[in-house]
Amino acid sequence: DFVGIGMGTPGSVDIEKGTVVGAYNLNWTTVQPVKEQIESALGIPFALDNDANVAALGERWKGAGENNPDVIFITLGTGVGGGIVAAGELLHGVAGCAGEVGHVTVDPNGFDCTCGKRGCLETVSSATGVVRVARHLSEEFAGDSELKQAIDDGQDVSSKDV
């Protein structure tokens, strides 16, 4: 028997209501009532939090955090996220985004971000961001490289290639 289900999701989360307020990298631009849907379908308790927050808790309990009461965890993937555990408590902050560093503006004239802003950290440092930067820089690059050739040939390029 299951006691309940816990889930981490990208984007802004209302942990009280169990809704995803906006997960732009998943193209969720409207409120998603995840808790209501899961609980009504399965009949067991459901808890929801931001994926970087959940990862920070996991890293604190079972990972490099070694159960330290103070842990900061940064996630790099489609976006850039972060979770902060201070004095043993997960910090949520406004809209559950205490550690969400991906949407800090690092270049006001930078690339457009999925959140609607311009020049966010994740536009250049996430898995998709480093590919975007490589494609942008390859336009001016006059040297010889396998990456430049792949981009020029229209091949799919991933962050692993970069």
Question: What are the functions of these language-model segments?
Answer:
Residues V3-I5, S12-I72:
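Glycine-rich phosphate-binding loop and adjoining helix at the ATP-binding site
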Residues N67-V124:
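Glycine-rich phosphate-binding loop of actin/hexokinase-like ATP-binding domains
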Residues P10-V13, G77-G79:
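Short glycine-rich anion-binding loops that position phosphate/pyrophosphate groups of nucleotides
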